[in-house]
């Protein structure tokens, strides 16, 4: 009887912690979203689903990778997917539908595979925290990116499909390419 009572009290205690924690996360996240984009926060409506074309667009995945690199090359930050530039909560359903099983696990796996292939498994493991909080009863994805220990270069495609390596940093509320003539100076100042 005593064991059951202790178990019941422990479960109630733990469930209260979870509720409080979820409420705090929800409140903090809503505040973050209402503040809008800045040097430490970027919103993306989707990871790969093009809302204008109503289909998968691999260029959007490049933009996600560019944003992750820009945060890493600067002071770190938070990428929020499922929220548009006007702070509207869109959710992840459009992206989920583009994946075989349409789950958040598959979404995270796809995201991590993109990052692994672009920047290496060690970076993806040590520098990213991927979460799927609910805001206004809608699941979104937050990616916390730590300030990087070494520079990240992003492979981007031009209009003709030609790929090249570019260096991006966070500047204000956008990811900016640093001109090739300035990269060495920035890298020397930032990473050494």
Show where each model-derived region lies.
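Conserved N-terminal catalytic/coupling substructures associated with nucleotide/phosphate chemistry
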Residues: 1-192
